[in-house]
Amino acid sequence: MPPPAAVASLTLQVPGGAHDVTSLATSPRTMAVPGTTEQLTIFYSGSMVKFDNVPREKIRYACRLRRLYSSLQRSLQTQDTSMFPSSSSLHIQTKRRGYSVIRLLREMLMVCSSTRTKPMLVHSDSIGAQRTGTPPSRRRIHARGKSRSCQEMSHCW
């Protein structure tokens, strides 16, 4: 077994200020106390949090949870993903779904006016339909070769 390496002084930046790790390790507050309690040190997001007088059972339980979480992560990463669609096919499905949503919105945004103004498709790249002499209840709206009467579109409002 190789001899233990020399302890180097390491300064950590924590929200409370800079702390020297070697002085923390040798201070009476951080020394392991024989008995049923120990100190728990957690390194999270670049900071170090210490808890004194933590029962050993809770520390063991926390270690088991950490091991369980890491093994679960590893198993999910190595799982066979052939049954899941690839990201490229998801992108294509999203595009198709987006197209159908746009078509649906275009159809739903057709406006039949009860006044004498001409009905039009509310969209930037559309041209308003021609006004006819028929009453608004029977007027047809033409969009992309399809025609619908105002009564047929009443379910959209």
UniProtKB/Swiss-Prot annotation:
GO BP terms: regulation of defense response; regulation of jasmonic acid mediated signaling pathway; response to wounding
Domain Tify: 33-68
Post-translational modification: Ubiquitinated. Targeted for degradation by the SCF(COI1) E3 ubiquitin ligase-proteasome pathway during jasmonate signaling.
InterPro entries: Tify_dom
Pfam family membership, one: tify
Ranges for region Disordered: 126-147
Induction summary: By abscisic acid (ABA), wounding, and drought and salt stresses. Down-regulated by cold stress.
Annotated Basic residues bias: 137-147
GO (cellular component) term, any one: nucleus
Alphabetical keyword list: Jasmonic acid signaling pathway, Transcription, Transcription regulation, Ubl conjugation
The keyword Cell membrane appears for this protein: no
Functional description taken from the UniProt entry: Repressor of jasmonate responses.
Assigned protein family: Belongs to the TIFY/JAZ family.
Protein name (database record): Protein TIFY 8
Designated gene of the protein: TIFY8
